[in-house]
């Protein structure tokens, strides 16, 4: 897929996007109908942009992104752009969420680790595909908020905890896939160790603008492949306890 040079595939921006003003009030039923229509339009856009996995597209169609953004930004929830969620963090651009999920090649029955829960949206998309999702968020307020939304929406296969993502979740390892939604300078070794053989880790690596990196674990080591340029917030925490 080819993009104009001016279009960066942004995962999580370092800045807040301004709102577009007040919107007319709709009845709850009409509002939900509008959200459903916008979700269908977004999924059609993702398909035309190169997302080909039907299971991923189905997950993106099912998960209500508007539930994971602040109320003042809900009218922008199905635009293909990141949005602020507070604490200098953002919810990722839907294309990036779909891209990372597709790259992870998650099958039903598998166990997934997410580093960087944020508002919980990526975890919800992963949970539509995986048997179990374990998600770590270093900012307590975001972890609490994500847990509340996910519980309200009925996601029983997601566990969120507050902690240092660099260390992973060793007591739940190994994981069939690991999705990292913040950028470390280098691939965290603890996460590689917690990846199952034949599992994949999707992680933006570097400072400033990063390269999305797909790591596949084999019996003899790891295979690392760099793909698209992205801009994620830096990963918070440290590689050692």
Regions found by a protein language model. Name each.
Residues 105-222:
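Conserved nucleotide-cofactor-binding alpha/beta core module
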Residues 7-16:
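Bacterial N-terminal signal peptides
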Residues 1-6:
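Positively charged n-region of N-terminal signal peptides that target proteins for export
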Residues 20-113, 124-125, 129, 142-144, ...:
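Class I SAM-dependent transferase core
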């Amino acid at each position: 897929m080819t993009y104009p040079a001016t279009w960066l595939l942004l995962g999580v921006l370092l800045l807040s996007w301004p709102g577009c003003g007040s919107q007319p009030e709709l009845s709850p039923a009409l509002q939900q109908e509008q959200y459903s229509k916008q979700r269908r339009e977004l999924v059609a856009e993702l398909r035309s942009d190169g997302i080909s996995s039907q299971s991923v597209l189905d997950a993106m169609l099912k998960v209500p992104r508007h539930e994971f953004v602040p109320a003042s930004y809900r009218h922008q929830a199905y635009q293909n752009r990141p949005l602020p969620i507070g604490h200098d963090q953002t919810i990722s651009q839907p294309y990036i969420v779909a891209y990372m999920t597709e790259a992870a090649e998650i099958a039903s029955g598998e166990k997934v680790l997410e580093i960087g829960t944020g508002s919980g949206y990526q975890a919800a998309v992963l949970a539509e595909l995986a048997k179990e999702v374990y998600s770590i968020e270093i900012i307590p307020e975001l972890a609490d908020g994500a847990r509340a939304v996910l519980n309200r929406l009925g996601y029983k296969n997601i566990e969120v905890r507050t902690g240092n993502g660099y260390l992973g979740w060793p007591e739940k390892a190994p994981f069939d896939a690991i999705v990292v939604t913040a950028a470390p300078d280098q691939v965290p070794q603890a996460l590689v160790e917690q990846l199952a053989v034949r599992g994949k880790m999707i992680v933006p690596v570097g400072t400033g603008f990063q390269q999305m990196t797909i790591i596949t674990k084999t019996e003899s080591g790891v295979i690392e492949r760099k793909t698209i340029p992205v801009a994620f917030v830096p990963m918070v925490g440290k590689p050692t306890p």
